[in-house]
């Protein structure tokens, strides 16, 4: 492609158009959710997704009480529990008024990108294309196969707020860690539904000891982490705060869509098997040259999901590490079935984080 033809081509791309529409009002809030994209610094253009959620808090709405009763699945809460800061913070995201048809503008690498109108659930998903050279300006990502592209939302004049987002631009080779959340890095007690709801809505999140340090040691050497969980997007702010507070490495989040208006809170407890298979499959297909470590727990169906994916992607999946909370054995009926045709040396049951491989041990699995 000649320089003239390239310039003409770039000028026709959507991101090159003047972007001005921004419907954000002062009573609306936006959450920018981390995303990822395959990155090749030798490519002329880089394609990457943006993900935003726009809503208006409705804490004093008439239907709040009924929805809260649904949300807690009939668990009797004391007045003190209902008024606790933890419960109010966690439950408020389920009670917001999701804003449909709102348009936002993102500032990315000196470009203004007009995002499409939000959907009924308040979410906006947009695929952007920018010149790779613009993403690398000012030395960003120098000497790194993978790095984080940061961006912001444009706010109306006089609005003092700032909304900041991240896109993980990930190189073709290296290690990717796919991690479950509940009972893998955070104590949830998923198998006891009453305890699960209390740990989710009433108690401070408690980390699984040692997991943050182990993940950090991997990321320090260049690994990228993807948190894939059956939790709903409404818990993303709390989960992101939790991972930051207890010093888990930052990464992308992959959670389920859920609206209390569309069903019941019992849908929150539905097995996430199909969702996890689809989300992780996308990661594997996006990065065919990367090696993957899957980390989960035995409380639900992580062994079965990970085993199925390992059979589909034999060369990529080099470790399946399962936190053993149900007294499993690798040679019992369940694990034998879950890991059928998966090399035994790639399967690990662990009780404590120090049983997970060090970075040097992980590299030996390449």
Located regions from the model:
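Short, surface-exposed connector motifs at secondary-structure boundaries
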Residues: 217-226, 285-292
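Bacterial N-terminal signal peptides that target proteins for export
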Residues: 1-8
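Intrinsically disordered, serine/threonine/proline
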Residues: 19-166, 355-366
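Short beta-strand edge segments in extracellular beta-sheet folds
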Residues: 166-172
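C-terminal cap/substrate-recognition subdomain and adjoining C-terminal extension
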Residues: 231-366
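Short, acidic loop-to-helix structural element flanking the phosphoryl-transfer center
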Residues: 201-224, 233-237
């Amino acid at each position: 492609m000649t320089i003239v033809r390239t310039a003409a081509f770039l000028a026709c791309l959507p991101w090159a158009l003047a972007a001005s529409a921004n419907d954000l009002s002062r009573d609306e809030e936006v959450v920018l959710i981390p995303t990822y994209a395959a990155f090749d610094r030798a490519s002329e253009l880089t394609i990457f997704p943006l993900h935003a959620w726009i809503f208006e808090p409705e804490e004093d709405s008439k239907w709040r009480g009924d929805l809260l009763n649904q949300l807690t699945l009939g668990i009797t809460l004391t007045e003190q529990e209902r008024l606790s800061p933890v419960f109010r913070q966690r439950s408020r995201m389920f009670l917001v008024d999701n804003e449909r048809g709102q348009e936002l503008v993102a500032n990315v690498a000196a470009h203004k990108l007009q995002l499409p109108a939000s959907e009924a659930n308040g979410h906006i998903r947009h695929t952007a294309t920018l010149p790779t050279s613009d993403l690398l300006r000012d030395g960003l990502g120098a000497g790194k196969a993978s790095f984080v592209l940061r961006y912001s939302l444009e706010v109306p004049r006089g609005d003092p707020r700032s909304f900041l987002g991240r896109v993980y631009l990930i190189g073709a080779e290296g290690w990717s860690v796919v991690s479950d959340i509940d009972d893998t890095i955070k104590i949830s007690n998923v198998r006891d539904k009453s305890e699960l709801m209390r740990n989710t809505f009433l108690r401070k999140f408690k980390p699984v000891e040692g997991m943050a340090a182990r993940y950090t040691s991997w990321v320090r050497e260049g690994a990228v982490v993807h948190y894939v969980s059956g939790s709903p997007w409404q818990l993303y702010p709390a989960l992101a705060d939790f991972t930051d507070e207890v010093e888990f490495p930052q990464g992308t989040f992959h959670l389920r869509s859920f609206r209390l208006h569309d069903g019941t809170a019992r849908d929150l407890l539905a097995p996430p098997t199909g969702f996890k298979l689809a989300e992780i499959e996308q990661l594997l297909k996006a990065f065919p040259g990367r090696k993957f470590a899957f980390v989960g727990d035995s409380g639900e169906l992580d062994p079965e999901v990970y085993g199925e994916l390992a059979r589909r992607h034999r060369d990529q999946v080099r470790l399946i590490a399962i936190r053993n909370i149900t007294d499993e054995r690798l040679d019992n009926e369940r694990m034998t079935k879950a890991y059928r045709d998966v090399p035994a040396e790639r399967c690990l049951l662990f009780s404590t984080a120090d049983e997970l491989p060090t970075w040097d041990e992980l590299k030996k699995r390449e």
